[in-house]
């Protein structure tokens, strides 16, 4: 028997697919129904990792399956190629970002091709291609003309290491998401996209995304943060500070708690705080200290509450006899509401923590159910639940929601404010102070101001002759590139030296894939045919970054007439990570898995260094990362076990939405499976064999094969790949139990049918093995072009039925019978069942009602 050798087989079939242009999807679509499957395109770091293998293998299963079902499948690949790592490489290694990036793309392209992915490589592009980013500049100018792009001075998150601005979403625990540096607050003139214009549409559109994970929809809804509340003004007690004669405007979502107010707080970046800081060094020092903290809402939420009393007081709008102190507080966000709040410590935890620290009053105004108004007090935790309002004059006795409405009505009647809807979402700051990004197509003229570059002068191409001998943006230091003439007046002018956030690049690439050769940014005809993406696959870490921005840009481009859809991704699947144990030596240094030998004695596992023999500490199972050296190189796995074994393992070990722990024993199991499958094909004799319906073993095998079709189909449709693989394992055991050697004609015929079905079913998972098996069977063409098998309904039908047994209307047991068993026989089996006999003890059976293949009802007394 010939042994299966993936080193020979896999390259052979990849070459055959390439030679036949098997996965080429013509720009002009055909009559087949379309199916667009896309995995989030990778950053070209230079090497793929096992997370890539899992992500792209999943997408490939879907693409191959849909192709076999008769769909015209679009399955493209590209590169999210701009960004800081290329500039870091330039500074650290003395290479140019462009060369470094394209070299990495070339290397990763070959690695991805080695995976046997059914990708249409003719549509490949990188976001750093001038052809691509020139089209991006074109639609950016459209949005600029429409007013969706604007420029203003703003307080921004500044990464002092990368020397660039970060969006709020890119600040993780107060640090830059790439550099890890502590982020600072600075004021810079920046370019923004008006994503807030689409806030309601983005929230409401989530209701249509029923094929998205609920957790992602919730994350986006919370990030946009639509809230209804009250915007109103506190008048200053006494003389108002200069420029604030109208008072201090605040926003609240809890107007029902107005009578519980104990102070008013303003953000350190609030204009009043900055005005006071300019006149008082102590206030200035406090404001500066606040700016050193984390910038995200989560960071501010978790930080120690700090404040400074300004000495100012304001008059309560509903009780003129009451004045409240004005504090500068580090937990108040300038970019939410008005940057000023009234604080009710009894019913807000942040306010309570602050009030306890600075000995400010805590007055409860919402009485929890069952509590006594005369004795209720707030302890360490604020009460944020439902209840009746008290200590609140005209609001007393109302529930929380009714009190909110009444408080808003009263403030509006007094002409001191009005009900308002506010969002946590801020406009998207897209300026980045770096070289390796899409140039913003704007020219600055002293006479004309910012002027868009004429479209016939696009793309604005990055200069190659730049130096990376110091941090910051080399475009600012370029001797010629930035100097140009104004398109409007012809006078001297300068190019914008900021480049676009890389999330702009990935906010529309899926639309460009529909026709990457189009002269316009997006071919309307191609986009109308292919969009939306039917199945998008990627990590949940992009829920409020890439996915939200892509939804926004798609809607903006629809309003420009470039696309017809509002939502870019009809279906979204977020896969889990690939994890591995992490190892350390005695010096606390991380050790690569390839250098570790594991020994198992009973339930105890120990590790030593393969070369030195020194003991190794086995650490936690964590996401594979270069920093912890717990990375397994895909190319090493491909060399040792074959590509198909690696593909199979990452889909078989756990549900795809969960993390999968990489183990050598696991991939070895997948390797053994591929060889066992091949052995079954190899052992099958050639020839035509007649089916024999009287041969029980043959019929059982045929039934198993046709049921397998349904199981695997359902597993792919439901993204339960591991379940489908498990069924394939089970069926292989069934095949082995009916060996070809010495088999009857009926069993050989059943085996031949089952093997043909098996070759088609494993094709999405192990495509190289499937092709070799298909060829071994002598089938015409390639299995990739074969249709998905259809189950024979009669053979796939379950022979057994589980019938519940009810005695006097209560379920007391169940029996298994063959489908179609006569009623008299079912009654006999039911009355002989031990559980039924136990419940009938002492009773007389008066009537038995059998609903064929459904249920047995026994009446007894």
Curated annotation (Swiss-Prot):
Its EC number is 6.1.1.4. One of its GO terms (molecular function) is leucine-tRNA ligase activity. PANTHER family: LEUCINE--TRNA LIGASE, MITOCHONDRIAL (PTHR43740:SF2), LEUCYL-TRNA SYNTHETASE (PTHR43740). This is Leucine--tRNA ligase. It comes from Caulobacter sp. (strain K31). The gene is leuS. The keyword Nucleotide-binding applies. GO terms for cellular component: cytosol. Keywords: Aminoacyl-tRNA synthetase, ATP-binding, Cytoplasm, Ligase, Nucleotide-binding, Protein biosynthesis. It catalyses: tRNA(Leu) + L-leucine + ATP = L-leucyl-tRNA(Leu) + AMP + diphosphate. CDD domains: Anticodon_Ia_Leu_BEm, LeuRS_core. The keyword Cytoplasm applies. A motif ('HIGH' region) lies at residues 42-52. Signal peptide: none annotated. It is found in: Cytoplasm. GO terms for biological process: leucyl-tRNA aminoacylation. Its main location: cytoplasm.
């Amino acid at each position: 028997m010939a042994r299966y050798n993936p080193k020979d087989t896999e390259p052979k079939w990849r070459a055959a697919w390439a030679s036949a242009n098997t996965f080429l999807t013509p720009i002009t679509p055909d009559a087949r129904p379309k199916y667009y499957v896309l995995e989030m395109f990778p950053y070209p770091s230079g090497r793929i990792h096992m997370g890539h293998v899992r992500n792209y293998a999943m997408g490939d299963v879907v693409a191959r399956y849909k192709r076999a079902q008769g769909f015209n499948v679009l399955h493209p690949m590209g590169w999210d190629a701009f960004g800081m790592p290329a500039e870091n490489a330039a500074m650290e290694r003395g290479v140019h970002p462009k060369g470094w990036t394209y070299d990495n793309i070339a290397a990763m392209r070959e690695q991805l091709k080695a995976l046997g992915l059914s990708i249409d490589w003719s549509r490949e592009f990188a976001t750093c291609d001038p052809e691509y980013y020139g089209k991006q500049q074109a639609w950016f100018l459209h949005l600029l003309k429409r007013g969706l792009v604007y420029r203003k001075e703003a307080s921004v998150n500044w990464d002092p290491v990368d020397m660039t601005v970060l969006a709020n979403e890119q600040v993780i625990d107060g640090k830059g998401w790439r550099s890890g540096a502590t982020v600072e607050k600075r004021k810079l003139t920046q370019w923004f996209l008006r994503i807030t214009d689409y806030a309601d549409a983005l929230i409401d559109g989530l209701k249509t995304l029923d094929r998205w994970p609920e957790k992602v929809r919730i994350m986006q809804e919370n990030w946009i943060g639509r809230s209804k509340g009250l915007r109103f003004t506190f008048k200053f007690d006494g003389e108002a500070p200069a420029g604030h004669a109208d008072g201090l405007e605040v926003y609240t979502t809890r107007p029902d708690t107005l009578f519980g107010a104990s102070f008013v707080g303003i953000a350190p970046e609030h204009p009043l705080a900055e005005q006071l800081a300019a006149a008082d060094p102590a206030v200035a020092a406090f404001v500066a200290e606040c700016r050193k903290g984390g910038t995200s809402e989560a960071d501010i939420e978790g930080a120690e509450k700090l404040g400074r009393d300004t000495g100012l007081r304001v008059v309560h709008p509903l009780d003129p006899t009451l004045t409240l102190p004005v504090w500068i507080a580090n937990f108040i966000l300038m970019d939410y509401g008005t940057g000023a709040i009234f604080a009710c410590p009894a019913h807000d935890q942040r306010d309570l923590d602050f009030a306890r620290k600075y000995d400010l009053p805590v007055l409860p105004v919402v009485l929890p159910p069952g509590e006594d108004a005369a004795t209720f007090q707030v302890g360490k935790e604020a009460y944020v639940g439902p209840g009746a309002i008290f200590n609140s004059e005209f609001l007393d006795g109302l529930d929380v929601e009714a009190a909110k409405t009444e408080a808003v009505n009263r403030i509006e009647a007094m002409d001191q404010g009005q009900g308002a809807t506010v969002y946590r979402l801020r406009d998207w700051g897209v300026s980045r102070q770096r070289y390796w990004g899409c140039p913003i197509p704007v020219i600055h003229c002293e006479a004309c101001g910012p002027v868009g570059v004429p479209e016939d002068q696009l793309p604005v191409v990055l200069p190659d002759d730049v130096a990376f001998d110091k941090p910051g943006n080399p475009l600012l230091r370029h001797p010629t590139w930035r100097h140009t003439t104004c398109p409007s007046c012809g006078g001297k002018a300068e190019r914008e030296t900021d480049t676009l956030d890389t999330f702009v690049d990935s906010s529309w690439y899926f639309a460009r894939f529909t026709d990457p050769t189009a002269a316009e940014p997006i071919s309307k005809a191609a986009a109308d045919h292919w969009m939306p993406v039917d199945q998008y696959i990627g990590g949940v870490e992009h829920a409020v970054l890439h996915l939200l921005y892509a939804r926004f840009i798609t809607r903006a481009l629809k309003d420009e007439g470039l696309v017809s859809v509002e939502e870019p991704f009809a279906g979204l699947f977020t896969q889990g990570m690939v994890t591995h144990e992490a190892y350390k030596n005695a010096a606390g240094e991380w050790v690569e898995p390839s250098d570790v030998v594991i020994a198992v004695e009973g339930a105890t596992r120990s590790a030593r260094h393969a070369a030195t023999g020194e003991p190794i500490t086995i650490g936690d199972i964590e996401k594979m990362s270069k920093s912890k050296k717990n990375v397994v190189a895909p190319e090493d796995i491909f060399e040792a076990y074959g590509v198909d074994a690696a593909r199979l393992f990452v889909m078989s070990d756990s549900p795809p939405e969960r993390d999968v722990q990489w183990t050598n024993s696991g991939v070895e199991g997948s390797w053994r499976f591929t060889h066992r499958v091949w052995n079954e094909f190899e052992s099958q004799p050639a020839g035509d064999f007649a089916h024999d319906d009287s041969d029980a073993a043959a019929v059982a095998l045929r039934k198993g094969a046709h049921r397998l079709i349904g199981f695997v189909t359902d597993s792919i449709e439901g993204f339960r790949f591991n379940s489908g693989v498990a069924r394939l394992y089970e069926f292989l055991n069934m095949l082995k139990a009916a060996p070809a050697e010495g088999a009857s004609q009926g069993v050989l015929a059943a085996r031949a049918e089952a093997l043909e079905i098996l070759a088609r079913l494993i094709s999405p998972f192990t495509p190289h093995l499937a092709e070799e098996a298909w060829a071994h069977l002598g089938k015409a063409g390639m299995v990739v072009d074969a249709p998905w098998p259809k189950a024979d309904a009669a053979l796939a039908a379950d022979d057994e039925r589980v019938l519940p047994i009810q005695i006097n209307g209560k379920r007391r047991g169940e029996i298994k019978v063959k489908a179609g068993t006569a009623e008299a026989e079912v009654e006999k089996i039911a009355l002989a069942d031990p559980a039924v006999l136990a419940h009938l003890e002492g009773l007389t059976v008066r009537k038995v009602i059998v609903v064929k293949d459904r249920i047995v009802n026994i009446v007894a007394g």
